[in-house]
């Protein structure tokens, strides 16, 4: 759009909203005299916005326009993301005050142009967005069809190049993208996101290569997964050769849609978000158990969008020994308090009657699944946390009894030996 028109739009919106916000705060101030710490402009979605993921997504763009989101929740706008930067610092401050909560925040790279990485990294560095309580994941929305229709990209390969070429360039020569080099030290994972319930064509061996994919149709979930994994695998080998940390593949999967999504992520990912559709496939569920692939589950989010809380498979997965943890998803819309993670744990404990031992084990799983450094994990759950079985459990830090860890490890080893006919090569360490 025309910059002058965009600037005018910005001035109109600010001019319209400014007095409105000031009036509300003024009225609240007159009611809550002497209680100014309680004043805020928190919002929460009405329940009618849930039930359908496509309708839920539309609420990010009121009246079909993304202007409000661009102003307040984007880093590449006319004010260079200053508002979002200040908001993020406040969240960092709250996490530091809580002391015992760490977060893995997600920011988006869309693949529309290669300069997105530098814009995002500059926003992080220029706003000094660093916290010992936070690491970052990059989420890639699966929106090729939209970009193709708009004429932004010419092929799927064009989108992949926009996502991965800057990463290869900065790995080979950090001086080529100095801000990105700094930012990537805080990036621990790559995520794929979008509505999994959308109908899609099943992938076949006759599908075109990314360079040949020039039609307007969106590739299947597994197509995205394979090519993102292939590029990330090569990138990580290069980063490891340079002494840099690997970036793990940790997509959203199994929240809805085809069960094949979970088969694709089983072959490629480090861990996944959600995975509730594993309840429909005992075979895949067993494979995820044997591989101990982490499932970061969000029952309250699922309850609002896809699956009633009492039907959530989390307690079944946990009792069977799958590597599950509790996490938050869309806390601004889903949760009702300033402690969304506490909400997840407290409601799960209450509804499913989880013991204190259960909660401690789930919290330990959460640390193991996370992308935080070896030093921090050693500080939180013990120096030998990466060892399997009781040897890797420091009861003084995890509060998980040795007998619980030993039982889990013994059953898992027996299952592995059963599958491999007594010749299983049991790894002694978990993936750090």
Model-predicted segments: where are they?
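Metal-cofactor-binding active-site regions of metalloenzymes
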Residues: 1-432
């Amino acid at each position: 759009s025309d910059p002058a028109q965009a600037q005018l739009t910005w001035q109109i919106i600010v001019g319209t909203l400014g007095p409105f916000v000031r009036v509300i705060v003024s009225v609240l101030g007159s009611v809550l005299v002497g209680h100014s710490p309680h004043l805020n402009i928190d919002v929460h979605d009405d329940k009618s916005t849930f039930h359908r993921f496509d309708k839920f997504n539309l609420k990010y763009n009121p009246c079909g326009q993304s202007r409000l989101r661009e102003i307040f929740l984007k880093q590449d706008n006319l004010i260079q993301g200053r508002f979002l930067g200040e908001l993020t610092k406040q969240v960092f401050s709250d996490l530091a005050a809580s002391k015992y909560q760490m977060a893995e925040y997600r920011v988006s790279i869309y693949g529309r142009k290669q300069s997105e990485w530098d814009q995002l990294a500059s926003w992080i560095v220029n706003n000094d967005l660093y916290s010992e309580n936070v690491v970052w994941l990059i989420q890639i929305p699966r929106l090729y069809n939209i970009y193709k229709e708009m004429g932004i990209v010419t092929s799927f390969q064009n989108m992949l190049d926009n996502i991965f070429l800057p990463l290869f360039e900065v790995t080979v020569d950090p001086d080529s993208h100095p801000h990105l080099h700094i930012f990537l030290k805080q990036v621990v994972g790559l995520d794929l996101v979008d509505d999994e319930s959308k109908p899609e064509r099943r992938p076949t061996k006759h599908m075109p290569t990314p360079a040949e994919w020039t039609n307007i149709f969106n590739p299947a979930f597994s197509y995205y997964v394979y090519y993102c994994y292939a590029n990330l695998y090569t990138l990580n080998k290069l980063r490891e050769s340079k002494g840099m940390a690997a970036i793990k593949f940790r997509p959203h999967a199994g929240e809805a849609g085809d069960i094949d999504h979970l088969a694709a992520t089983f072959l490629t990912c480090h861990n996944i978000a959600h995975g509730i559709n594993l309840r429909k496939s005992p075979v895949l569920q067993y494979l995820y158990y044997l591989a101990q692939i982490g499932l970061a589950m969000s029952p309250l989010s699922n309850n609002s969008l896809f699956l009633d809380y009492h039907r959530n498979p989390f307690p079944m997965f946990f009792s069977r020994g799958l590597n599950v943890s509790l996490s938050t998803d869309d806390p601004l819309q889903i949760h009702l308090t300033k402690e969304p993670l506490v909400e997840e744990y407290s409601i799960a404990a209450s509804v499913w009657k989880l013991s204190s031992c259960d909660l401690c084990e789930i919290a330990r799983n959460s640390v193991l699944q996370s992308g935080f450094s070896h030093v921090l994990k050693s500080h939180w759950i013990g120096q030998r946390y990466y060892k399997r079985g009781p040897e890797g459990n420091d009861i003084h830090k995890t509060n998980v009894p040795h007998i619980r860890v030993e039982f889990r490890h013994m059953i898992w080893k027996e299952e592995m030996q059963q599958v491999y006919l007594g010749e299983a090569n049991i790894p002694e360490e978990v993936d750090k």
